[in-house]
Amino acid sequence: WLCAHLWEHYLYTGDIRYLGHIYPLMRGAAKFFLSTMVREPKNGYLVTAPSSSPENTFRMPGDKESAVSICLGPTMDTQLVRELFTNTLEAAEILTLTDKPLLDSLKSALNQLPPHTIDSEGRLMEWLEEYEEVDPQHRHVSHLYGLHPGNQISPTLTPELARACRATLDR
């Protein structure tokens, strides 16, 4: 997430020298995720684990009493990783860097991240599975990071996902 702020600063200023200074941080963060992400067993997606969706909890199927927060690859994590990998690739291209092994790994990993998914109610899913939320009116909508402040979801480029975000907010 912090690398996103650095990247936004570069986009605003267009300062190539600044980009050269922040690239090692972006590269390091990307390498960290490449080295710590795991295969999700159901679909083989590359995900963060263990993780959680900020401050939100869900119920395990068949258990109406528990409040679980630990999961594999929550949507916000996937959005942050997708953004970081994409920005790191773009920064390397702008800087004309030839870090082929890393760049190839980032491109490959991007293709292995879980896609955004819409639940049976038409909302953007917060987790890989369609869990019952403990508090459906929970104040956090971190899984909409890809809509804002990120740019992975937009009404013009991904209208179905934008409608799912709207449904999440309207709930």
What kind of feature is each model-predicted range?
Residues W1-I16, G20-P24, P74-R171:
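Active-site core of glycosidic bond-cleaving carbohydrate-active enzymes
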Residues G28-A91:
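Acidic/histidine-rich catalytic neighborhood
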